[in-house]
Amino acid sequence: MSLIKMLFSDLDGTLLYIPPRLTSGVSPENKAAIRRLQQHHVRFAIATGRSVDFLSRTFDPELVLDTVGMCGASIRLDGEMIYQTDFDPDEIESLLEVFSDDRYERRFLAVTPDNDYVFEDPQSEAAQEFRLNRSGYIQDYRNILDLSLAEYIQNPANPHINSCFCHFDVEEGVDYYKDMLKRRFFNRYQIVQTSPYSIVIMKDGANKGTGIAKIAGLLGIQLEEIAVIGDSENDFEMFAMIPNSFCMDHARPDIQAKAKHIVHSVAECIDFILQENARQRLEELNLL
């Protein structure tokens, strides 16, 4: 392992994992480990499917960190937004056409740069169920707009769309529409599976891995000097791109198989990195 200069952590099921809840908060153990990491001059950052300010806004206002948000659709570095993907209205129209066949029940929505949600049909049963949030899931949006997505894109004054999400009632819907999108658009869009039942659609090849690479390039850090930790499907791209990858031990076996190391917590990952960094420095001094 190279000397690690930066660690990117997923949120749900990773940094925010306090058993048995995947999204509970930053444990005292993890918070103390982050401080140790930073004291050793290793940057701690976030790579998440959530918005860039979800962590500080929802859980801890002190944790304003470099963030690859929305699975790579938006990036914040040193407190500044440095990148956001941007769908033109005609591109949204084409996506709506793909999802118009009603082959599988779904909830299709788009996200604006202000983190407002725009549903394909805001009056649909799926949209109403999302608003009710019976499961108590910690949601991440500023407002749910009353306009339909088709109405929203007709107004040129509205901000362009950052990314699109689609959640299906059955897993078969994911495979069906992923195939449809790839055949229709010939890899024009990045389609990232975020769970067995959902996908996010983005432009410019955006994903967690490419977002991390953008930050690394700006900071002058090599990919071999970065570590990543996650637990779900939307971490596959960063596991593939970053050699020093860690997966949470509660993740499914097929997800764990994508990573190099398996750990129980972010704190365990950090301790491993600090130990390896210490060993690397001793080797450089020819003391090992």
Residue ranges: model-predicted function:
Residues 2-6, 15-17, 27, 199-288:
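Mg2+-dependent phosphoryl-transfer enzymes with acidic/Ser/Thr/Gly-rich catalytic loops
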Residues 3-8, 29-42, 181-185:
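A short, Lys/Arg-enriched amphipathic alpha-helix followed by its capping loop at the start of a domain
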Residues 4, 41, 64, 161-162, ...:
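Short, well-ordered alpha-helix to beta-strand connector turns
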Residues 28-132:
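Active-site phosphate-binding/coordination module
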Residues 44, 106-108, 191, 245, ...:
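Hydrophobic beta-strand scaffold residues
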Residues 55-58, 181, 255:
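Hydrophobic packing residues within well-ordered alpha-helices of enzyme cores
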Residues 62-63, 71, 185-187, 241-242, ...:
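Short, structured coil segments at secondary-structure junctions
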Residues 107, 112-229:
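Conserved acidic, metal-coordinating active-site core of Asp-based
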